[in-house]
Amino acid sequence: MKILISYFFTGLIYLLMSSCHIAPSKMVDNPTPVGLPNSIDLQKYKTAYFASGCFWCVEAIYESVYGVQEVISGYAGGTTVNPNYQQIGTGRTGHAETVQVYYDPSKVDFKTLLAVFFNSHDPTTKNRQGPDSGTQYRSIAFYNNDNEKNIIEDYIKELTRDQLFGRPIVTEIKLLSVFYKAEEYHQDFEKLNPLHPYVRQISIPRLNRFKAKSPEVLKESK
C-alpha cells in the first residue's frame, strides 16, 4: 500500500510540474489590455495574434522567427474583462493563452507567420496541446481585417485538401477584439527559466522540433 501511495504522489507531482500552470507568490490581478504598442519603437511594426497552447512555448517559437521584433504573452478570445492567470486557469473565461507578435512586413508576411502557427502545434486537438488541456489552450488564428481572415481561410483549405494532418483541423478563426497582456512574470518565461521542469520537458523540445522543421524562417544565429 505504501508503494502504491508513493507512486500516486510521484505521478501527481510529475503532472503538476509538467503543466504550463503555476501558482506564483505574487499575482497581478488586473493586467492591462493592450491596444497600442507600449513602446514607440514598436509602433512601426504590424501585429498578429495566435493561440496554440501554452504561451511560454509559443512566445519562444515566434521570437525565433526572422522579421519578428517582439512577442508578448497574453489572453484573448473570451468575454471576461481584465482576466488574470488564476481566472484563465479555470477555463471559464472564454480566453485562450495568446501571443501578440510584432513583425516587420518588409521581412516577413502574415502568411508566413500563419505557416509558423500550423507548423508548431497540432491544430487537430480540441482544447488541448501536449500535456495542457482546457479551453485556454485551444487553437485560434486571430485576424485584424478581412484580408487576414481570407488568408487564414484559404490556408486551412489548402491544408485540408492536402490532408497534411490526417484529421480535421479544429482551429478557430476569430476577429481580434481585445488582447490583454499577461502578468509580467510570464513574459520571456522560457528564456528566463530554462531549468523550469515544464520548460525543459515540454517547451524547449517543442521549440527545437519547430526549428528542425522550419529552418528557412529562423533568425540567423548570433
Predicted features by range, described:
Residues 7, 16-222:
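Flexible coil/turn and secondary-structure edge motifs
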Residues 1-9:
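Bacterial N-terminal signal peptides that target proteins for export
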